[in-house]
Each structure stands twice: as structure tokens, then as C-alpha cells.
Amino acid sequence: IVSKGIYRPIFIEFGNIHFFELDLQGRHKGFKGLLSLFKELKKLRPTHIADLHSVLRSNVLYFLFKINFFKIKRLSKQRGERKKLFRSKNKIFKPLTPSQFRYCEVFNRLGFNLDLTSHEFPGPLNIETETQLKINQMPTNMKWIGIAPFASFNGKIYPLDLMQKLVSFLQRDHQIFLFGQGEYEVSKLEVWTNAYQNVFGSYNLGSFESELEIISNLDLMISMDSANGHLAANYNIPVVSLWGLTHPFGGFAPFLSKTKNMFISDREKYPKIPTSAYGKKIPKGYEEVMRTIDYNEVIVRCLKVLEKPKHHQSL
């Protein structure tokens, strides 16, 4: 696996994976850095290479491996279909192939027969002592809800005043874990952790490994169209997702997520949705599309999901 070091903990469960850490700010920076990266990876003598990113940087590597006769396949971005889905006029509103299945296609073209219908989820991670010490004052009889209220772009973020109503209600009978990072997000989340008894800021855990321990033991994750929903889905945690300027038809819904767990902004009122794959493009008048998602309906759905037996590890 070639990726940023922060993602290493995701692959800890696999004993036969070698994680190669990118140094994009150092020896792998820029075009010269890509050449260095190619030389380092070439020394590993891979028999098969899967480019699951298909962006400019990985395209350069694809070309270098290709002209050196390595067996390499890359991800299809479905650019033609995406353009038709995201354009504002004459939009063709039909679902693209989910990203997880497009990843499988890459491996299948390399000769590996992957079938997600027989997928096995990993079990919850063991909550290590260091993490337990930080959460040991929590009630043991409550179900755990993760809430990740932020996303990479504003077009995917549920209004914080409405999200606070969700937090306020759900924390009465459930333990809430808030997920966010960076000074701005933490400053917003700390308002809620200080205001409500059963709300904990997961940024206080101090490491991504500890956050994964909590995520894998949740009973429910509430997320935007963002990474935390995918991380929870990796552990078969139910995900209730809220969608703004993006849409599940774009192919980026959490793995095996149920349609009834996805709350979509009103397309009758805002027909340009989805405006892009990542929610960066905000058309004029579309700044508040997510206010069309009724937080009461989200609460009702969350309570329905939480009727299932408690999932998390007993502390």
C-alpha cells in the first residue's frame, strides 16, 4: 500500500500488507520527487500494480511503470458519466458505479477475482488502556454515536445550528463522540462538549489509532459526505449520512449504506444537485440547501437504527 502515513492504522489488521509511506513534503515532492518515488517502488519489484487514485501524480507513475513493462491498471473515473450527472443543464440523473466496485474492477483487470458480495467485515478493534483512561468516566449502559459534522467543503456541511439540535437531543440517552480536526473545527465542537454532559471530543484521544478504536465500536455514525462515514462503514457500523451539494449517485456513499439512511437535500427546490463530485462548487442561491433536511426526521431514523443490540466493547 502506497499512501500517506496517517492512513497506516487502517491497515493494521492485515498481516501480509507492506505499507509504503509517502513523503510528499520531502523526498517525494514535485516531479523530481515522483521520479524518486518510482525508483523506490521499482526496487520492490511488484508483479502487479493498481492505481486506485487516477490523478495527475499517480498518472505520472502509471506512465513510468507502463513504459518499463510493469503490469499496471488504473481506476476508471467515469469522467463522461460524471460530467452528465454534475452539469447544471440537461443533467442525466442516474447513479454511477460505486467507488468500491470500481476499485474491484481494477484488481479484476489485473487478474485477481474480487467479489464484494462475499465481503467479510473486520470485528471491532480492542479499546486499548490509553484510550480507556480518557473515556472511563462515561456511562457503561449507553449506546455510542459518532457524529462527524464537518466535510472538506462548505457545500457538504449541515448547518451547525441544526446539528446542535441533533446533538442536544441524542446526547440525553446516548454517549456522543464528536469527530473533527484543526483549530476551527475543534473550537466549534468544544462548544458542544462543554455544553452537554454526554458529549466527548474524539480529538482529545490524541491519535488516529485511538479514534479508529472508538469508530469500530460505535453503534451509529452520523456523517456528512465525508471520510468518517467510510471509516465507520469499514467496520460494518450503520451510517446515517447527510448530503448537500453532492449526492449518493456520484458513487461515494459509504459501503453498503442503506438508502433510507441517506438524507438528501431537496432536489425539487435545488435541481442542480449534485453540482460536483466533492461539493466545492456552490451555485448562487444554493448556499443553504441542507436546511431542507429536517433534523427531526434524522433523529427518528437514528433512533430506529439504535434499536439494535449494543455494539461497543464493554469497558
Show which residues each predicted segment covers.
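Catalytic machinery of carbohydrate-active enzymes
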Residues: I1-L315
